[in-house]
Amino acid sequence: MARRTKEEAQETRSTIMMEALGLFCQHGVATTSLSDIARAAGVTRGAIYWHFKDKEELFLALWHEMCAPLSHLLNASIDVDEPDPLGKFTTFLIEVLRTVAMCPAHQLMFRIMFKMMQPDSELTSIRALIQDEIQQHTQNMRCSLTNAVHRGQLPSTLSVERAAILLHCSVDGLIMNWLNQHERFDLAADAEALVQALIFSLRHNLGQP
């Protein structure tokens, strides 16, 4: 009985999160209330508060839920003992693009994120949360690239800072363009070639000034 209750609680939590994701994308994070989410999920506001302190915590839980399936690849690439950090990092970038292309929930999350990062974003508290997560992600990229340099997989002259900026902006740009114009290219099919082109540029350019 206790196990069933735990399973039901997890199902309720997942339902709340998925309904919130759709409403956030459709109506905006700021204008979507917890009452709106409760109605869509078929639960009470109290049920939401049982799982989440507030809307910010709910949004952050959604963010981490989207990131979790790929985190092991990025974590491996920032491990100083990993023998192939560049390989793990390359696979991570490819899988990010493929996952967005094939998973509607990830597409919704990126649409929300891109909207929230605009200068006139309506909810500064969640925008700050996103900025913190992006800064941590960029730092992890720098660690991955540094490990690759130390392993001789990238040139010692590589500017890790510039490389991280290039990769972050390129991946975001590919996702944003694909979300706006699916017909321009096949993100899932082209993911490996696009990422390999970026890695090639790191091997041959972006040296220190």
Per-range role (PLM):
Residues 1-27, 31-43, 57-60:
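Basic, helix-initiating cap at the start of DNA-binding domains
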Residues 52, 60-66:
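Alpha-helical DNA-contacting segments of helix-turn-helix folds
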Residues 42-52:
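Short hydrophobic/aromatic patch on the recognition helix
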Residues 88, 101-128, 176:
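Amphipathic alpha-helical segments used for helix-helix packing
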Residues 112-115, 142, 158-177, 190-201:
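Hydrophobic alpha-helical segments that form the core
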Residues 61, 75-108, 160-167, 207-208:
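Hydrophobic alpha-helical connector segments
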Residues 68-71, 75-76, 87, 102, ...:
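Amphipathic alpha-helical packing segments from all-alpha helical-bundle domains
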